[in-house]
């Protein structure tokens, strides 16, 4: 799946999601992996510098706590999940780099995406280290 804020349709007047888009490739797996992919959006340019309180958006930690309260799960070490998601994105961008190299990339921004492989890999390793990897 591709569960993130820009793949959601929100109700026009109520604080609720009406639809989730881009789930044609969804799989069964650890639900926290998908949820933490959503949580990563808090660190991306769209939300990173926004006044979340003024927008009535919970902080990253608050959102994790709400999700875990609703699902009955304990809040895990999110660093492992962020590392996993960043590593997965690095793999995707490496695939894009291969298509750029082979001349089969369809997206006009493919080269820009491919350039993210190393920074995503480094960020993944940093989160893994925060979670205890050596």
Task: Give the role of each language-model region.
Residues 32-71, 85-103:
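Active-site activation/catalytic loop segments of kinase-like enzymes and analogous catalytic loops
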Residues 73-85:
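All-alpha amphipathic helical-bundle segments outside canonical DNA-binding/catalytic cores
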Residues 13, 25, 40-44, 68, ...:
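A generic structural signal for secondary-structure junctions
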Residues 17, 27, 52-55, 75-78:
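Short, surface-exposed helix-loop/turn micro-motifs enriched in polar/charged residues
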Residues 99-134:
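Regulatory N- and C-terminal appendages and interdomain linkers associated
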Residues 1-33, 37-39:
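Active-site acidic catalytic loop and adjacent metal/ATP-binding pocket
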Residues 29, 33, 57, 107, ...:
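Short, conserved loop/turn and helix-capping segments at secondary-structure boundaries
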Residues 17-21, 59-74, 119-120:
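Short amphipathic alpha-helical segments and their helix-coil junctions
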